[in-house]
């Protein structure tokens, strides 16, 4: 199935039914009075988080969703039927943005979470409501109100605890295959991974965490090189980043230069995401002669001026991978416990997530501005025909 992580749709709630203008007419009741019923409420549009979905591809082919209208009222004080609510399923991890106001309406982070995105129109009132001591035969009714209509943008971000970061062909997909049941495509050429992959790393019966592998970055990704930065958004929900570095690249490039380029592109995408804890994972040590490994590792760490944790692994053979995932699990457990016990740590995490959402809105606004600009430029183009004068010659 094709992976689609962005989509734009239109939702429209149902219109409320109009109130009825009617008078009671029965035998021997010449002046029965008003009996017009109320219209029905329209249907609202709701989104529901569904953990069985992992792509927004359905919204690529159906972009308009409308809830039914309420039915009009009838005589004999009969109310119109309400329009049924429309429930639209979205993948867990979907951020819902109003394209017109850029308001973040909701972040669907749990299965079964329900979000109202378009409020139904209210019913109209029948003439029975306007009867009074001075107006025994009112001819007044009210129409149903229009349902809310919205232009929505969905941005899906995978739900993961740990994210893998690195250049293409650094061994990220091999690592996630080694420590989980995920089976992403692995090959000896760059950009093998074209979409994010998730793997559940199990360390015991009830101990596990989710790892995300995203397509690799290259220098200039912030300017559109390679696959650009669009997949980095899938790391914004993670708590820990593992920077995977190939110590023996096949093109004989400098691993330090590649690592610095990735760090720069990460900062270009999100200054807040760049503040996340990041561990250095030196991969493919098995490709180096054993006597060269310590000096190579020391050289990379020293030139990067790396002060955080460093792990030396071979993803293809599995050497060092268990120590890495066990350390990551311990760190995640300690972090969650700290946030549960320390209000300052909890607020810090919430503030980081808020800042990343603000950055996401800013990126969406910039993207929409770029889309609007060509249209505005077309409108402003000078057209000589606009100033043509039609001349009619008299016979």
Curated annotation (Swiss-Prot):
Task: List the SUPFAM superfamilies hit by this protein, alphabetically.
Answer: Obg GTP-binding protein N-terminal domain (SSF82051), P-loop containing nucleoside triphosphate hydrolases (SSF52540)
Q: What is its main location?
A: cytoplasm
InterPro entries for the chain: G_OBG, GTP-bd, GTP-bd_Obg/CgtA, GTP1-OBG_CS, GTP1_OBG_dom, GTP1_OBG_dom_sf, OBG_GTPase, P-loop_NTPase
**Which top EC class is given?**
hydrolase
Protein name in UniProt: GTPase Obg
Q: Does the keyword Membrane apply?
A: no
Entry-linked HAMAP family: GTPase_Obg
């Amino acid at each position: 199935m094709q992976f689609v992580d962005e989509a734009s749709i239109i939702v429209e709630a149902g219109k409320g039914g109009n109130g009825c203008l009617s008078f009671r007419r029965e035998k021997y009741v010449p002046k029965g009075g008003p009996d017009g019923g109320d219209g029905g409420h329209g249907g609202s549009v709701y989104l529901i988080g569904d953990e069985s979905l992992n792509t927004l591809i359905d919204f690529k082919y159906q972009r308009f969703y409308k809830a039914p209208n309420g039915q009009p009222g009838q005589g004999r004080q009969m109310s119109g039927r309400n329009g049924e609510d429309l429930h639209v399923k979205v993948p867990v991890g979907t951020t819902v943005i109003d394209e017109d106001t850029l308001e973040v309406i909701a972040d669907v982070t749990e299965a079964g979470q329900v979000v109202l995105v378009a409020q139904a129109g209210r019913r109209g009132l029948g003439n029975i409501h306007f009867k009074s001591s001075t107006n025994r035969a009112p001819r007044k009714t009210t129409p149903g109100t229009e349902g809310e209509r919205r232009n929505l943008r969905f941005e899906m971000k995978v739900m993961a605890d740990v994210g893998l970061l690195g250049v293409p062909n650094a061994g990220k997909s091999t690592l996630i295959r080694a420590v989980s049941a995920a089976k992403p495509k692995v090959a000896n050429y760059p950009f093998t991974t074209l979409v994010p992959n998730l793997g559940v790393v199990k360390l015991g019966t009830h101990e596990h965490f989710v790892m995300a592998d995203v397509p690799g970055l290259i220098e200039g990704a912030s300017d559109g090189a390679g696959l650009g930065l669009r997949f980095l958004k899938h790391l914004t929900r993670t708590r820990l980043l593992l920077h995977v570095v190939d110590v023996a690249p096949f093109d004989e490039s400098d691993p330090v230069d590649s690592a610095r380029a990735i760090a720069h592109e990460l900062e270009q995408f999100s200054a807040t995401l760049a503040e996340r804890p990041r561990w250095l994972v030196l991969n493919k040590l098995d490709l180096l002669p054993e006597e060269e490994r310590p000096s190579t590792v020391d050289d990379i760490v020293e030139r990067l001026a790396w002060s955080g944790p460093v792990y030396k692994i071979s993803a293809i053979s599995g050497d060092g991978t268990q120590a890495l995932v066990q350390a990551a699990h311990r760190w995640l457990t300690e972090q969650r416990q700290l946030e549960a016990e320390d209000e300052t740590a909890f607020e810090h995490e919430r503030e980081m997530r808020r800042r990343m959402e603000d950055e996401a809105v800013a990126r969406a606004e910039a993207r929409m501005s770029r889309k609007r600009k060509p249209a505005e430029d077309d409108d402003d183009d000078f057209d000589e025909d606009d100033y043509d004068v039609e001349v009619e010659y008299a016979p």
